[in-house]
């Protein structure tokens, strides 16, 4: 129903329409291929090749043997999504094995891909895989995809299907035998001065549990950003049962025959709109405040070595300028998702249409959006998440001592931004910065979260993971080495393995 981003408008102001089907439209947008008949044998061969790769690339193979207590982990990773899995393998490649990844979900349900992610395809091109393979080609997504579905299929796609990516992550964890402990919800993290480690207070299958670790990596992506952003006008005027957020568990078949309003213009708003129509919604109206849907994705511009590797080294004023510019520009859906939605007959996009008033009456939602009045059966908030570490209960006993940008940086007049000012001020390895020296233990916590997205330059997504994780892992292994330097030197002096 829509031309590319430079589309014309119809006779009604700010309603985008299309008279042609874009070349980006795909009738098989939702299709998932069937594995090859011999996929099992092909995958077995890939795993054999991978095992050979790991043996060849194992130098230096010696692991850390200086744990002060076997009851204390060297590293606890909170979250077993793609970031947590890759962090664990990267630590292993650096000889740090006393690690556990904790995840509150059951096995194969970790991360967002089978939870609230509803995009048919990933938003990044297929070759951007977050560096999960750590330089080992046979661990790369493309090798797994070709083994299971064929080289022709791999060559034919531009973006990986979301559910295939989820399958790959399952295989990644299984073939590497990653130390994932599922059904474990880390609820509080505190510092124990006597033991010089973090205490992770948790529930494991409903029972209380306590774990200890020298270092903690918070690898919970979007879920470690502060929670859902639901506009106050919706919260205050609609009953909870009448609306959802895109991060909710939504029963899409229940929307069959319904008229639905989607608020927000980012990727998740469009993803959910497509699923609503696929489930049989009569119509989906998507409304945004901006006069024009953003059509510029500077993330694509940033995908080069200089930016990814060195942005975090920039002076604070430069990082602030980049971040402020990106926030003002706004988020946009991927082109393939945008065109797929705009070519659906039941979909309409309304720009320049902020919610002015809204109410619920006799099973319907009546709202004024810009200068239009609508009534719908349901409403979905595609309004993103709040970036606020104070709203993250797992961090409640740490955040009072974590420095924010407002504590260490003053922007020029006219460049103030309250949300950015509240972001945690992270070090160059994504570690928290303590407000005072007495809380220096906070630098042993690493924040691999969407809450680090703007000012650190690392968005905790596939475009950034392979550049963020080496910084974290190097910093951890460096501290482990220096903290154990006396033991290590004693071992060095005691070494007595004669060559002849």
Regions found by a protein language model. Give the residues of each.
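Flavin (FAD/FMN) cofactor-binding and adjacent substrate-gating region
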Residues: 118-151, 301-314
């Amino acid at each position: 129903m829509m031309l590319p981003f430079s589309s014309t408008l119809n006779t009604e102001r700010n309603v985008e329409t299309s008279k042609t089907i874009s070349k980006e439209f795909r009738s098989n947008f939702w299709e998932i291929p069937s594995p090859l008949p011999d996929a099992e044998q092909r995958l077995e061969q890939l795993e054999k090749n991978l095992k050979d790769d790991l043996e060849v690339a194992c130098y230096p193979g010696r692991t850390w043997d200086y744990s002060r207590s076997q009851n204390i982990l060297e590293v606890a990773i909170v979250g077993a999504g793609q970031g947590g899995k890759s962090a664990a393998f990267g630590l292993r490649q650096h000889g740090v094995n006393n690690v556990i990844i904790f995840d509150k979900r059951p096995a194969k349900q970790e991360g967002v891909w089978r939870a609230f992610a509803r995009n048919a395809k990933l938003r990044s091109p297929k070759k951007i895989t977050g560096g999960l393979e750590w330089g080992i080609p046979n661990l790369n997504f493309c090798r797994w995809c070709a083994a299971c579905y064929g080289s022709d299929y791999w060559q034919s796609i531009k973006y990986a299907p979301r559910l295939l990516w989820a399958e790959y992550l399952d295989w990644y964890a299984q073939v590497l035998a990653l130390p994932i402990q599922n059904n474990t919800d880390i609820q509080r993290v505190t510092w124990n001065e006597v033991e010089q480690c973090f205490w992770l207070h948790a529930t494991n299958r409903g029972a209380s549990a306590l774990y200890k670790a020298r270092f903690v990596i918070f690898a919970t992506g979007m879920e470690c950003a502060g929670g859902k952003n639901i506009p106050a006008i919706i919260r205050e005027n609609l009953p909870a049962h009448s609306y959802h957020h895109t991060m909710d568990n939504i029963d899409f078949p229940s929307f069959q025959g319904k008229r639905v309003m989607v608020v927000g213009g980012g990727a998740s708003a469009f993803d959910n709109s497509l699923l609503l129509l696929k489930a049989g919604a009569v119509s989906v109206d998507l409304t945004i405040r901006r006069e024009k849907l953003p059509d510029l994705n500077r993330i694509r511009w940033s995908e080069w070595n200089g930016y990814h590797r060195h942005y975090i080294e920039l002076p604070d004023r430069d990082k602030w300028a980049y971040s402020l510019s990106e926030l003002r520009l706004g988020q946009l859906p991927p082109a393939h998702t945008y065109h797929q939605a705009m070519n659906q007959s039941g979909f309409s996009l309304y720009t320049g249409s902020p919610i002015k008033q809204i109410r619920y009456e006799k099973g319907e939602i009546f709202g004024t959006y810009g200068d239009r009045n609508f009534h719908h059966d349901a409403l979905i908030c595609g309004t993103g998440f709040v970036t606020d570490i104070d709203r993250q209960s797992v961090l409640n006993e740490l955040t009072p001592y974590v420095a924010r940008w407002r504590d260490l940086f003053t922007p020029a007049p006219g460049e103030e931004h309250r949300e950015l000012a509240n972001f945690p001020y992270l070090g160059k390895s994504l570690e928290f910065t303590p407000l005072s020296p007495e809380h220096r233990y906070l630098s042993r916590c690493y924040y691999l979260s969407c809450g680090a997205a703007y000012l650190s330059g690392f968005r905790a997504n596939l475009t950034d993971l392979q550049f963020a994780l080496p910084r974290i892992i190097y910093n951890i292994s460096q501290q482990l080495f220096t903290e154990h330097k006396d033991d290590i030197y004693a071992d060095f002096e005691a070494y007595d393995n004669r060559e002849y």
